[in-house]
Amino acid sequence: MCSAFHRAESGTELLARLEGRSSLKEIEPNLFADEDSPVHGDILEFHGPEGTGKTEMLYHLTARCILPKSEGGLEVEVLFIDTDYHFDMLRLVTILEHRLSQSSEEIIKYCLGRFFLVYCSSSTHLLLTLYSLESMFCSHPSLCLLILDSLSAFYWIDRVNGGESVNLQESTLRKCSQCLEKLVNDYRLVLFATTQTIMQKASSSSEEPSHASRRLCDVDIDYRPYLCKAWQQLVKHRMFFSKQDDSQSSNQFSLVSRCLKSNSLKKHFFIIGESGVEFC
């Protein structure tokens, strides 16, 4: 559990926790309408098959955060937890170079000074990492965005290790979810986490959109919740990623954004080029 978090906090830590977080409402106007913009405490899930642009979207949002305000960024810090060992620093640098009006090694280093990268190799490693993060959020009041790519990386390993007991299979991820909830709420963060499609859609899924909405985006949503309920209940906003099948648009991707707070459903198209994500 998260009992290890409970201790007396100093005045400095209290101020960092309550006052130091900048708003991320402007993180991507093309993706979030005003009423659906992420606010402190929000948890958003990017869901879809491999190769549908989820990690590229994370690079895009990371760049938006760590770029200086003079270059259209938010100038805030980001902590990126990589569980797939797929993070490409050169790719992030390339995106930054394309978005800076005058790119130089000094400016790139200045941007990357607001970026923190952590690797985790198992669900237990992830849990221990989350336990250790409180002091970091206390000492970095500009750290506003937590990214987890991906939360489903250890699903099959945990299933095997848990044997036939679903409770044991989900035990570590359930504790991770509880710690994520506490960190996000106590330190007024926004969390983006990716999950990969490994189950086929169930027609009776409780996550299915309404009949009218389903007609609009039926081909884009292939979702069946398979992670623990503790995680499912935390998500405020879910985005379903897919790649266009049309051979003429092999570089085009789409996502269906479902905000569970407002129950809104919107579809977006984007391409991925050398400079990163571009909305159509």
Swiss-Prot record:
Name the GO terms of the biological process aspect: centrosome cycle; DNA repair; DNA strand invasion; double-strand break repair via homologous recombination; in utero embryonic development; meiotic cell cycle; mitotic cell cycle; multicellular organism growth
Q: What result is annotated for mutating E170A? A: Does not affect function in double-strand break repair via homologous recombination as shown in rescue assays of XRCC2-deficient cells
Listed result of changing Q248E: Does not affect function in double-strand break repair via homologous recombination as shown in rescue assays of XRCC2-deficient cells
Which InterPro entries is this protein grouped with?
Answer: DNA_recomb/repair_Rad51_C, P-loop_NTPase, RecA_ATP-bd, XRCC2
Which Gene3D superfamilies does this one have? P-loop containing nucleotide triphosphate hydrolases
Cite the effect that the entry attributes to E75Q.
Does not affect function in double-strand break repair via homologous recombination as shown in rescue assays of XRCC2-deficient cells
Annotated effect of mutating I95V: Does not affect function in double-strand break repair via homologous recombination as shown in rescue assays of XRCC2-deficient cells
Describe the effect of R238S: Does not affect function in double-strand break repair via homologous recombination as shown in rescue assays of XRCC2-deficient cells
The effect of L61I is:
Does not affect function in double-strand break repair via homologous recombination as shown in rescue assays of XRCC2-deficient cells
Q: Where located? A: Nucleus; Cytoplasm, Cytoskeleton, Microtubule organizing center, Centrosome
Q: Which UniProt keywords apply?
A: Cytoplasm, Cytoskeleton, Disease variant, DNA damage, DNA recombination, DNA repair, DNA-binding, Fanconi anemia, Nucleus, Phosphoprotein, Premature ovarian failure
UniProt similarity note: Belongs to the RecA family. RAD51 subfamily.
Disease / disorder:
Fanconi anemia, complementation group U: A disorder affecting all bone marrow elements and resulting in anemia, leukopenia and thrombopenia. It is associated with cardiac, renal and limb malformations, dermal pigmentary changes, and a predisposition to the development of malignancies. At the cellular level it is associated with hypersensitivity to DNA-damaging agents, chromosomal instability (increased chromosome breakage) and defective DNA repair.
What does the subunit comment say?
Interacts with RAD51D. Part of the BCDX2 complex consisting of RAD51B, RAD51C, RAD51D and XRCC2; the complex has a ring-like structure arranged into a flat disk around a central channel. In the absence of DNA, the BCDX2 subcomplex XRCC2:RAD51D formed a multimeric ring structure; in the presence of single-stranded DNA it formed a filamentous structure with the ssDNA.
- The molecule here is called DNA repair protein XRCC2
Q: Which organism is it from?
A: Homo sapiens
